[in-house]
């Protein structure tokens, strides 16, 4: 298939990357039924990123003839016998008016239709918005048959969420790899220090044995020298308490030696202390009554809150919280309520900052749309028992979770409508009203733009 550059002004540019197929036409029929068939109109329209019906209709408007494009078969027909060069010239005019950016000339544009029924071209290369001349005949056809809009809203949000999850998993893998490297380095340093201590102990043992050698050995000097030169000599370590203490004093510094605690003296002191019949030492303690106060066992819900706080104790990760929540056998709503109480219990002013700070843990608890409803209901339940200062920040918290792709606008609006329909007059619902109204107005504006 022969290709040519898009736009007459770029015809001689050998390195121009925007190309389209060269037009192929075919004359069909005779007499009054003669028609011109643009054989590859579908391929040309794909290259221009415009519907094939637009180009076909433009030929009909400019030639004053009837034109028709069949969506099922992809056949483009214009009444009358028309030369290929003439149709190609009209196509260049169409490209200049409805495809190329008026600012940079690139064909990477998208047709936009405003509320006031004005057509404009938005350039993806430079961002320039070009206003189309509304006096042209084709504009009426475009307004009646607007181009298909790209998938937005939920699909975009789902893509962003999937991308964030992918980045989080990558960061978690990197952190785990760094931790393994650190552990390996620590282990290597410990092994090296242990080898150094062992070497010092060996040299100290040798010096001890040199000092404690017998007089007979000093008389046999030649024999001892011969023994030192022998490679098969095996040194033995003196395991007596005195030798061990001496080695400790030689190897450890004064500061370290004070930290070493020998348990032998303490055990001897304890053995010497007299024990009375009542089990007390030195008569200082009195008899402990056998009747111990009954300890109330915490409920499963309180145990879950305790487990969550324990998992968030030192170097917490979202995966740890996810494992704790997955292991719980409580109802789903209780499982969702527990993280809020564990994370934000007792928080007053600054509730929103805490939510933004810990939103990664909330994101783990909300894997799907059903869990979003549970989270909104958990916020409502938490608002009934939280600090009044935190209660005022409920709408800001909802917006923070909405901006963080943890809650969708549909979930928030549906929850609010259900609460109002059920006659709930809680302060959480009242405080959330301005934010819900803002969501609804923004949604209606988007629908107006689409129309």
Curated annotation (Swiss-Prot):
Pfam families: eIF-5_eIF-2B, W2. Residues 290-449 form the W2 domain. SUPFAM superfamilies: ARM repeat (SSF48371), Translation initiation factor 2 beta, aIF2beta, N-terminal domain (SSF100966), Zinc-binding domain of translation initiation factor 2 beta (SSF75689). GTP binds at residues 29-36. Keywords: GTP-binding, Initiation factor, Nucleotide-binding, Protein biosynthesis. One of its GO terms (cellular component) is cytosol. Residues 147-178, 208-226, 266-279 have a biased composition (Basic and acidic residues). Residues 179-188 have a biased composition (Basic residues). Residues 143-233, 263-299 are annotated as: Disordered. One of its GO terms (molecular function) is eukaryotic initiation factor eIF2 binding. Signal peptide: none annotated. The keyword Plastid does not apply. SMART domains: eIF2B_5, eIF5C. GO terms for biological process: formation of cytoplasmic translation initiation complex. Coiled coil: none annotated. Belongs to the eIF-2-beta/eIF-5 family. Catalyzes the hydrolysis of GTP bound to the 40S ribosomal initiation complex (40S.mRNA.Met-tRNA[F].eIF-2.GTP) with the subsequent joining of a 60S ribosomal subunit resulting in the release of eIF-2 and the guanine nucleotide. The subsequent joining of a 60S ribosomal subunit results in the formation of a functional 80S initiation complex (80S.mRNA.Met-tRNA[F]). This is Eukaryotic translation initiation factor 5. It comes from Zea mays (Maize). The gene is EIF5.
